[in-house]
């Protein structure tokens, strides 16, 4: 992308993402329908820019593959590259909004599921779902703006999540608590020094926690 921002460069377009694949997937999801108005709206905005972006990508790729730049000194390539870069920047902004809408919808659905589980015998599973949801939000917020994080609020949330996890009184709960403790340590490191290594460690430990969570069936969190 950086090379294309400077104008047309031979071969640069070939290293760009395949936006046509995403376009096909979103069109398929649109046909299947959705119950979330905000998600639908943001998805349609992404599709609108993809309808402009994909043809530009194909034009630039064809121009590059045919070596037409040898005939016009790259003039059309510069024009297409500028058009492509502008469309990608708009796509990035629209896709970020779409992703936020998806996260919001998924979070709302998860919260509803947690409340239902709390009223059943699946209290351990409810606790781990709530813990994981809250931890995901915390890690995402710290990653986005580590230097602006409210350390006191983060510590309070970490302690509350730990209490929830420790309410799962079986070996699977212990495994998750151990994995969680690694996340806690790395989050605190980021709050002390938000360098790239510490941020990477936090994400790695969080991913390990999610892996432990995914490797456990719901019933195991309520087994004796």
What are these regions (language model features)?
Residues 18-25, 49-52, 56, 94, ...:
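Amphipathic, well-ordered alpha-helical segments in soluble domains
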Residues 58-89, 196-203:
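Polar/charged, Q/E/K-enriched amphipathic alpha-helical segments with strong coiled-coil propensity
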Residues 77-180:
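Extended amphipathic alpha-helical interaction segments
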Residues 41-44, 48-51, 55-58, 82-89, ...:
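Solvent-exposed, polar/charged alpha-helical surfaces in well-ordered, non-transmembrane soluble domains
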Residues 45, 49-52, 56-63, 127, ...:
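Solvent-exposed, amphipathic alpha-helical segments
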Residues 1-74:
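N-terminal Sec/ER secretory leader and immediately downstream segment
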Residues 156-224:
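A cross-kingdom marker for long, charged
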Residues 61-72, 103-114, 221:
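Structured alpha-helical bundle/scaffold domains in large eukaryotic membrane-trafficking regulators
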